[in-house]
Each structure stands twice: as structure tokens, then as C-alpha cells.
């Protein structure tokens, strides 16, 4: 039965792959439990925090930081960043030279081409403490030696902290370094933003020659960040920039993504404010999908109106320069209008400006929502002519934002809107994504409540995959029934208007049912699920309900057990821990407070299909459940996997008498899993308070996943922690062990563990800085690979060279997988047909051709097996010579 379940885990896989998976599972069963190979990379002598961060590059190499590394002497905490091959062989080491340089303490940034950047904001430049440095490093060869101005971008003054505010990677692969604390001569914290090439980096001291810089004290250029545009360009936000005697006018500076922007910030190269404290670019610069952008300046002054606010449209190819005004921006006209405070981006590239604080001719805070074109923007004063507005003080139209629909249209939420009779009835207004909507909010253009405090749309609007939407109004009143709640379906092409009612909504029937209070979850197939954990079943309070709705027509009427899955006991609160949508359209309901017939708070995780949903009561027949009081299965939610499967997190699950051992349970995305949690179907802890899965489950792109359990005890070492690689087929069950996990060795240090995954090699790298090591975990039977021949050696330029490698397995015949040979000069070849030479030995070979003389380094790697683990060879040096033909016909070197 287990084999059948595991063989059908991934919908759409080919028959041949399923057959191979069957064989792999059968072989593993024949040889015992699943195996894994582990290889420990220990920190070099002097290491103090080796493994603080671990990053896997696209080529499989590993970057490991050790910011507390001590140089010989010792010189304490100079820091180091190392590059390793996937097999654990060290390629290079970059380190600091002065005490407390802490190279790599700012983190590692991986570029799209695989090169990476090392941030060292505490690096010392001579007498300048914390000058800071950012070092560009090749993904293949790394860099060895000390950080310096010759290999890094560096600061020149104490406290410059180059790179301290991050690095923005542009869409074209280049990057921008932000250093707001950089000093420009005597101008302390003038700030600098430096462009770097993604292929060659940037080095030397920061200056106006290579960077965009401020010129006044505390300009702090770039402090609000750098926004990458979709076309490769970028925009720098500097709200504290001073224009001469005008303090904090702010600036937003356009940068060319191919060459960068350099020199001093000014009105000639930037959008700037016209008054002190305008703080242009205060919060953000927002990138539009087409490459254009918007600058938010909610504190901009309009004449005598302080903080009227402005939102400015900028071209993604040329930017926008000069002073903010009503001619180039959408602006407010009353004090504290704060126009530009919030913006919603539509799926078609247009945008909506949300101004809930806007006042209309003395009527305070009526609110306004203004449509803008993504190609031309919108300018002028906010008004009823260009905006959807409220009619009464404190209507605050748009105060809860907008919902963006897949059709390109949008929905405005205004729960504080008042009708003619009552306050806070609320309104939800549909708007066209090509032309917007203007005028007053009313029942003619909006879905509205009917009673005071209904606050229509207060809990949110959920956009469905097919473009339609669902409005959540948990405080809606049904006649005399207070807070019955409602979930209302709306068309994504025309919206819905008028009053909420049982005729157009799914509603509660008892006071405080608050239908929709938990959530409305959009499924991948366009349908949806309404979560109402406070719903009452007759006189039994808070049993909870989760109701399925069709994405084409919605769901109306009262919630009941006939149209919803419900609890049966008080405070079951079905769905309280959320509903998780799977990528295949199905879903899983987490209800940690569910009681079985005999056990309180056993908890349940209920699988349902996205085509028809599920109704009736929760039970062990339709759900994964706990067995003991307080198991609270699903209490930490459900993690969806990339292949449509899922993992249920239950760190409070008891393993028999072992309290809070914890469990992580794999579920099939097509059929789910039901019955009691156990070691037979879950990864489990073996000691009290192991709390397996409490610290997260991370989904990987290939359908596998990583379980983090910081509270796991390694024998007598408490809270040593474990990081588990769960395979895409759900085969990782039972107790945590070295066969499935990387285990910690130091008490109470699991929070410092860091992991990185390599999908090509199926290798999990876990940094354990408290142990000064990185552990490489490779599922499968251990192997060892060696290059045994390169014939001929040396070879002539253009001559085929046959490379051979031998793979030795600790167990089982080698029947699958492939070996790739890769030269440091870029040549590569692959052999995917193993030739058996002994019981557990196979040979692989293929041909490389070198077209230039010289020596190259060649490595081999074994990957792609369902049974055996990855391994890599040591490097083999091969020489190629240029052959000359003499007049007599003989060849020579």
C-alpha cells in the first residue's frame, strides 16, 4: 500500500519515471530504511562562526561565511567568506586584515549569472574604522586574499559603512550598492549609491566619479532604497536630501541600468520638492510592470496647504526631473490630504491612487480613489471629476485599499462609508481597469451594508483566479441578528451593487457567526472557500464552518452542514488555523481545536477537492487527526508543495507518552491523507518538547521540502536542532536520524542553523556556526567518484580527449544516474549510461575537445540517481599543446 501511494505522488509524471521510482523504493526496502550520505566541511583554522550563512550558486558551488574568523596572530574577527565545490572541496577564501573587519557579516548577494557579492560594512580601511566594503566574486574561481580597494568597493572615512543599506539587483543582472552613511568630505552622511557591473563588478573608493552622491550633511542619498525597474533601469529615493537652504525637500533620481548614475543629486537629474520637509520619495518609488514608475510624496506642500501630498509619474526610459507640481503630479489641495500615501497596481499595468485622508472643500476626510494610466500617468488636483469620492466626513473612501482582479479591473473597500441613515454601513465599489470610476459612492455603483456598523468589505476582498471576486463582511447584520456575517460573490467584469442580503451572499444565521471572518481563500481553478471559525451550529457555539463556492456563480443562503464542512463540538473552530490552497486546485483545512469523540483539541487537517469541496462533519475518515488531548494537529498550518502535495505541521503532537514530540506529515495532493498521525506516516520527534516542524517547513521548487525543528534533542544535548530534507514522494517518515536529517551538536544553538538546497545534486547544505561546520546531506546510498583517465594527456589543440571516471557505491549495483565532466575553461560532456565493472562499481566516460593550448582543471560529478547519492571528484589537471606542422610534414610542439 505504501509503495502504491508513493508511486503516484506527482500528477503528470511519465510512466518510465514512476517505474524507476517503484524500483528505487523497492531497493531501499530490500536494503533497509532509506539512506543518506553526509559529508562534513569543517571550518579552517581560526574559524569562529563558520556557516553563519550558506548560499548555493547556480553552478552548484557553495558560498560559506565566517564573520568571526581570526587571522594568524591572532587578529580577531577579521572575518572570511569561502567558496567550495559541491563536493566540499575549497576553491578560495576571502578575508579581512584588521580586527573586527568581520568580512561577510552583511551577508551574501547572489547575482543572476552566479557571481556573488560579499557585504562587509565593518571593514576597516587603514585608520578609517567601519569604512565598509562590497566585494564582487566569480562563481567559478572565487577570490582569495584580503579585502582591499583593488578588489572591492570601499569607503574612505570612518563610519562610511559602504553597502550597509543593502544591494539592489537589477533585472539585467547589474546591481546598485546603497551607502547612506558615506561622507562627502566634511558633509557627514551625505550618502552614496554606486552602480556595479554584473559581469565585472566595481572596485575602488566611493566618490562622485563612480557614484550618485549627496552634497549636504545628512542628505543620506539612497536611504529610502533603490527601486529596480522591469527594463533594467532604477530609481534612487532620498527623502532627506537638501536643496541648498531648503532642508529635507527630498529627491528621486533616475539611473541608467546599463551605465549607472553618477555625480551630485540635483534638480537637473532628479525629481525634487519645492519646500522644506516635502520629503519627495518619502516612502517608496513604485515600479510599474511596463518599466515606468511612481514617486510617493505624501508630505509635499501645495502652496499654504502642508502635507497635501503628491504622486508623480516617471518614464522608465528617461525618468522625471524638476520640481514636483500639479503639472507633473496628482496632488492634494488641503492640509493633510496625504495624496500618494497608498497606491494599488492593476494587473494590466495601470494603477490606482488611494487617498482616504482627502478632504473635499472643507468636508473632512471623505476620501478619494483616483485612476492612473500606466503609460501616461495622471496629474492635477484630486477631485470628484477624476476620482471616486465619499459624500460625508470620515467616509474615508479607499481606507482599506483595493483588490486587484485578474481581469485588470479593481474593487475599492470603504467600510467607513455612511449612507443617508446610518454610519459605517460600508461600501465596496467596482472600477474599470482601463478608465477607472469617478463620482460619489452610492448603492447604485457599490455593494453596501444596510445597518450601522455593517462595515461592508471590512475583512477584505478576495480576487479569484478567473477574475471574479468575493467580499467579506463579518460584521453584517441579518435583521435582528448582529454580526451574522456575509460573503458576497461579485463579477469581475461588471461588479455587484445594492445591499448585501441572503439572496446574493452566503450568510450566518446566529449572532456572532461572523461568516467569512477567517478568510476567503481563492483556489487555483477559480473556485473559492469561505472560512467561518466562529459559526454556531444551533446552540453549540464556535463549531466553525468552511464553505465551498463556485467561482462562476458564487454561493448564497445560510451556512449549514449540508453546504459546508463543520465541527460538532463547542470551540472546534473549524478552519481557524487556515485553509491552504494547493497548486492543483485542491485545498486543506487546518482545525487544531477540533475534538474527537474522546479527545479534546486532537486537531484535524482535512483534504478537499477544488472541484466539489467537502461538506458534513470532520472525522478521522476524512481528515488527518491527533490521538491525544492537545495534539492540535495542523496547529502550525499546512505548507503547500510545488508539485501539488502538502505537509501538515503539528509540533504539539504527542508520540505516545512523549509530550510535544511533534510531527510533520506529508499529504498527497490528489487524495489527501486521513487517520491518526503516527511514525508510520510522519516525521516525528522522539523526546519531550522536540516539537518537530515548529520552526518551519520550506517548500522547494522540485516538490521536496525542508523541515526545521530547533527544539529537537540530540540524545543528551537539548535543543540541538535538526534540519530535515523531505523528499517529493513523501518517503521521509519515522524518527529524525542522520538518514533524513542534519543534526545539531551544540545545545540551544539551533536557531543559528542556515540551509541551502541544490536541486541538481539533491544536496542540502546546512551551516552550523556554533559547531564551525557545514554538513552536506545527500539522500541515497553513499558513493565516491574518481577521474581515472584522460587520454591522451597532453593532447593537441582540437584533439578529442576521452575522460573516464569510476563510481564506487557502498551498496547496490549502479544502474542509473549520469556523470558530467566540466573543465575550468568551460567545456563539458555527459555520460548517462553507467557501465558496471564490479558489483557496486560503474564506469562513465565521454569526450572533451580543447581548442586552446594550456592547462585546465577538470572535475566530474555524479547526479540524477533515484537510488544513489551525489558525489563529486577531485580536480584533474589536463594539458593541451599547440601542434605545428613543419615543411617536411612532421608535427612538433
Name these PLM-found stretches.
Residues 12, 31, 889-891:
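Short hotspots in intrinsically disordered terminal tails
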Residues 30-780:
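Conserved beta-strand/short-helix segments
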Residues 9, 65, 110, 178, ...:
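Selective for proline/serine-rich intrinsically disordered segments
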Residues 7, 13, 46, 60, ...:
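Intrinsically disordered, low-complexity segments enriched in proline/serine/threonine
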Residues 16-31:
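Bacterial N-terminal signal peptides
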Amino acid at each position: 500500500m505504501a509503495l502504491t501511494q508513493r508511486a503516484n505522488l506527482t500528477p503528470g509524471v511519465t510512466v518510465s519515471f514512476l517505474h524507476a521510482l517503484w524500483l528505487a523504493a523497492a531497493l531501499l526496502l530490500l536494503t533497509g530504511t532509506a539512506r543518506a550520505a553526509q559529508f562534513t566541511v569543517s571550518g579552517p583554522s581560526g574559524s569562529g562562526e563558520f556557516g553563519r550563512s550558506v548560499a548555493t550558486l547556480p553552478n552548484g558551488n557553495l558560498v560559506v561565511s565566517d564573520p568571526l574568523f581570526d587571522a594568524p596572530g591572532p587578529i580577531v574577527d577579521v572575518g572570511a567568506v569561502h567558496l567550495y565545490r559541491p563536493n566540499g572541496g575549497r576553491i578560495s577564501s576571502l578575508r579581512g586584515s584588521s580586527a573586527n573587519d568581520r568580512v561577510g557579516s552583511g551577508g551574501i548577494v547572489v547575482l543572476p549569472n552566479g557571481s556573488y557579492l560579499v557585504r562587509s560594512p565593518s571593514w576597516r580601511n587603514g585608520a578609517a574604522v567601519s569604512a565598509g566594503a562590497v566585494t564582487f566574486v566569480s562563481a567559478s574561481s572565487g577570490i582569495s586574499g584580503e579585502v582591499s580597494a583593488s578588489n572591492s568597493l570601499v569607503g574612505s572615512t570612518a563610519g562610511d559603512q559602504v553597502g550597509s543599506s543593502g544591494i539592489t539587483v537589477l533585472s539585467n543582472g547589474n546591481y546598485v550598492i546603497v551607502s547612506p552613511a558615506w561622507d562627502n568630505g566634511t558633509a557627514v552622511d551625505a550618502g552614496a549609491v554606486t552602480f556595479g557591473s554584473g559581469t565585472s563588478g566595481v572596485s575602488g573608493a566611493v566618490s562622485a566619479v563612480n557614484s550618485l552622491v549627496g552634497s549636504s550633511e545628512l542628505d543620506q542619498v539612497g536611504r529610502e532604497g533603490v527601486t529596480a525597474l522591469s527594463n533594467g533601469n532604477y530609481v534612487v529615493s532620498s527623502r532627506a536630501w537638501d536643496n541648498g537652504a531648503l532642508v529635507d525637500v527630498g529627491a528621486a533620481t533616475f539611473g541608467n541600468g546599463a551605465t549607472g548614475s553618477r555625480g551630485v543629486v540635483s534638480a537637473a537629474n532628479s525629481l525634487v520638492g519645492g519646500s522644506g520637509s516635502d520629503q519627495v520619495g518619502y516612502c517608496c518609488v513604485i515600479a510599474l510592470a511596463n518599466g515606468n514608475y511612481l514617486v510617493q510624496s505624501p508630505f509635499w506642500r501645495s502652496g499654504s496647504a502642508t502635507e497635501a501630498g503628491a504622486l508623480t509619474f516617471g518614464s522608465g526610459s528617461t525618468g522625471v526631473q524638476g520640481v514636483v507640481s500639479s503639472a507633473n503630479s496628482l496632488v492634494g489641495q488641503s492640509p493633510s490630504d496625504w495624496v500618494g500615501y497608498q497606491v494599488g497596481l492593476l494587473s494590466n499595468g495601470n494603477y490606482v491612487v488611494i487617498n482616504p485622508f482627502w478632504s473635499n472643500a472643507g468636508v473632512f476626510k471623505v476620501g478619494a480613489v483616483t485612476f492612473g494610466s500606466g503609460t501616461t500617468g495622471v496629474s492635477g488636483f484630486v477631485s470628484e471629476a477624476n476620482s471616486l469620492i465619499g459624500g460625508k466626513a470620515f467616509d474615508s473612501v479607499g481606507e482599506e485599499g483595493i483588490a486587484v482582479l485578474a481581469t485588470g479591473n479593481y474593487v475599492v473597500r470603504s467600510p467607513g462609508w455612511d449612507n443617508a441613515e446610518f454610519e459605517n454601513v460600508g461600501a465596496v465599489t467596482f472600477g474599470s481597469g482601463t478608465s477607472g470610476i469617478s463620482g460619489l459612492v452610492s448603492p447604485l455603483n457599490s455593494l453596501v451594508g444596510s445597518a450601522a456598523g455593517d462595515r461592508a468589505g471590512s475583512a477584505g476582498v478576495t480576487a479569484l483566479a478567473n477574475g471574479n471576486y468575493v467580499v467579506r463582511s463579518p460584521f453584517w447584520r441579518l435583521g435582528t441578528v448582529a454580526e451574522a456575517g456575509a460573503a458576497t460573490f461579485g463579477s469581475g467584469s461588471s461588479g455587484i451593487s445594492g445591499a448585501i442580503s441572503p439572496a446574493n451572499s452566503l450568510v450566518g444565521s446566529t449572532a456572532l457567526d461572523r461568516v467569512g471572518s477567517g478568510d476567503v481563500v481563492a483556489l487555483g481553478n477559480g473556485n473559492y472557500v469561505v472560512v467561518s471559525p466562529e459559526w454556531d451550529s444551533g446552540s453549540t457555539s464556535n463549531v466553525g464552518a468552511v464553505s465551498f463556492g463556485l467561482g462562476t456563480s458564487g454561493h448564497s443562503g445560510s451556512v449549514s452542514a449540508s453546504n459546508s464542512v463543520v465541527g460538532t463540538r463547542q470551540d472546534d473552530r473549524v478552519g481557524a488555523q487556515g485553509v491552504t490552497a494547493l497548486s492543483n486546485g485542491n485545498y486543506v483545512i487546518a482545525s487544531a481545536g477540533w475534538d474527537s469523540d474522546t479527545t479534546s483539541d486532537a486537531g484535524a487537517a482535512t483534504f478537499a477537492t477544488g472541484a466539489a469541496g467537502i461538506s458534513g462533519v470532520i472525522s478521522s475518515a476524512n481528515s488527518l487527526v491527533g490521538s491525544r488531548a492537545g495534539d492540535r494537529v495542523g496547529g502550525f498550518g499546512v505548507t503547500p508543495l510545488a508539485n501539488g502535495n502538502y505537509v501538515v505541521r503539528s509540533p504539539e503532537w504527542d508520540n505516545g507518552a512523549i509530550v510535544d514530540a511533534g510531527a510533520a506529515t506529508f499529504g498527497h495532493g490528489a487524495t489527501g491523507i486521513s487517520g491518526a498521525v503516527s511514525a508510520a506516516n510522519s516525521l516525528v520527534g522522539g523526546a519531550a518538547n522536540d516539537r518537530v516542524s515548529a520552526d518551519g517547513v520550506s517548500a522547494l521548487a522540485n516538490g521536496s521540502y525542508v523541515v526545521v525543528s530547533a527544539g529537537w534533542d540530540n540524545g543528551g544535548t537539548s535543543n540541538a536542532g535538526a534540519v530535515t530534507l523531505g523528499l517529493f514522494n513523501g518517503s521521509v517518515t519515522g524518527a529524525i536520524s542522520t538518514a533524513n536529517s542534519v543534526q545539531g551538536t551544540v545545545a540551544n544553538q539551533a536557531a543559528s542553523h542556515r540551509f541551502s538546497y541544490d536541486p541538481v545534486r539533491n544536496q542540502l547544505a546546512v551551516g552550523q556556526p556554533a559547531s564551525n561546520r557545514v554538513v552536506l546531506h545527500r539522500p541515497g546510498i553513499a558513493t565516491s567518484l574518481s577521474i581515472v583517465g584522460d587520454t591522451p594527456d597532453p593532447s593537441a589543440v582540437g584533439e578529442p580527449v576521452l575522460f573516464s571516471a569510476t563510481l564506487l557505491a557502498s551498496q547496490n549495483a549502479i544502474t542509473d544516474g549520469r556523470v558530467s565532466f566540466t573543465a575550468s575553461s568551460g567545456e563539458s560532456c555527459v555520460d548517462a549510461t553507467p557501465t558496471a565493472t564490479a558489483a557496486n562499481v560503474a564506469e562513465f566516460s565521454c569526450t572533451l575537445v580543447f581548442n586552446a593550448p594550456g592547462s585546465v582543471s577538470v572535475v566530474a560529478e555524479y547526479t540524477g540517481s533515484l537510488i544513489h547519492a551525489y558525489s563529486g571528484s577531485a580536480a584533474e589537471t589536463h594539458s593541451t599543446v599547440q601542434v605545428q606542422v613543419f615543411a617536411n610534414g612532421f608535427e612538433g610542439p
